[in-house]
């Protein structure tokens, strides 16, 4: 299945590789929009089952599908099936790569075949690694790429010296426009576990409500639960005696960030980058089953910068929630400043600049 776009005939051509999750697709789309605004042709390679199949076509970009699966956290039968398909899938990608001026990879299993095809054909490859610890695909190709763009300073050690730059991850401009918030008498806490919600955060937050109520600690809670636990958590919150609201999802996340004094959340690369852009202090609870435990590495990086506190998933109880929230309230201004200093604005523009620099005629 191919979705066509109308673009200038003189445009350079860039292939965007990487998908499976929103964390891979959304930053790639930001770079793709920037390239398109400069008059270039941009097309994506992905699978029919990944997030890219839902997000890319509505943006008007050409979208070519391949058959490939992941190698992390799957059975040996699935690994064998993926590896057996790899040669033919890479060969098919060669046809798409042939006319590309350069390939942009966000990593992830979807990026493997087009990147390998590009390397064989000596097409320049620019890779963007969103996490503090690179994913499997980016680790494999690390020394072969033309340029590497990373979000965390420590990640540069995995890529060639002199060809690596800390650009940050593309983040919506609305997050950068959030002004510093003066703390009022009531601590505004935002709890979000992502679009699906987090069982750990939902459970710990619910257990903490009696502690906040009994202590008289002034808080107002906005809790995004995901759809599965929404009714249960909302009913429990209604009996808590606390101010706030429980919602299944948040459509305008920049507005929710702007209203918060403190954010309690997971530590995916996109979330960490949004926290930094918004200058928001946070309590980070890494998802323990993320590939290579990359969320813990992301959280550790922000904690070292003084912008966050890390709490392990297994340790996040109601008591721990209450303890950590009350212990950081005197540090929120300093943490927010540290978060904003961690941010890297203009990541999509810088990525587009570098792609133009390395593009072959």
Curated annotation (Swiss-Prot):
GO terms for molecular function: UDP-N-acetyl-D-glucosamine:N-acetylmuramoyl-L-alanyl-D-glutamyl-meso-2,6-diaminopimelyl-D-alanyl-D-alanine-diphosphoundecaprenol 4-beta-N-acetylglucosaminlytransferase activity; undecaprenyldiphospho-muramoylpentapeptide beta-N-acetylglucosaminyltransferase activity. The keyword DNA damage does not apply. One of its GO terms (biological process) is peptidoglycan biosynthetic process. It is found in: Cell inner membrane. UDP-N-acetyl-alpha-D-glucosamine binds at residues 21-23, 131, 172, 195, 250, 295. Its EC number is 2.4.1.227. It comes from the Bacteria. The keyword Nuclease does not apply. It is a peripheral membrane protein. The lineage of its organism: Bacteria, Pseudomonadati, Acidobacteriota, Terriglobia, Bryobacterales. Keywords: Cell cycle, Cell division, Cell inner membrane, Cell membrane, Cell shape, Cell wall biogenesis/degradation, Glycosyltransferase, Membrane, Peptidoglycan synthesis, Transferase. It catalyses: di-trans,octa-cis-undecaprenyl diphospho-N-acetyl-alpha-D-muramoyl-L-alanyl-D-glutamyl-meso-2,6-diaminopimeloyl-D-alanyl-D-alanine + UDP-N-acetyl-alpha-D-glucosamine = di-trans,octa-cis-undecaprenyl diphospho-[N-acetyl-alpha-D-glucosaminyl-(1->4)]-N-acetyl-alpha-D-muramoyl-L-alanyl-D-glutamyl-meso-2,6-diaminopimeloyl-D-alanyl-D-alanine + UDP + H(+). InterPro entries: GlcNAc_MurG, Glyco_trans_28_C, GlycoTrans_28_N. Its main location: membrane. Pathway: Cell wall biogenesis; peptidoglycan biosynthesis. This is UDP-N-acetylglucosamine--N-acetylmuramyl-(pentapeptide) pyrophosphoryl-undecaprenol N-acetylglucosamine transferase. Belongs to the glycosyltransferase 28 family. MurG subfamily. GO terms for cellular component: plasma membrane. Cell wall formation. Catalyzes the transfer of a GlcNAc subunit on undecaprenyl-pyrophosphoryl-MurNAc-pentapeptide (lipid intermediate I) to form undecaprenyl-pyrophosphoryl-MurNAc-(pentapeptide)GlcNAc (lipid intermediate II).
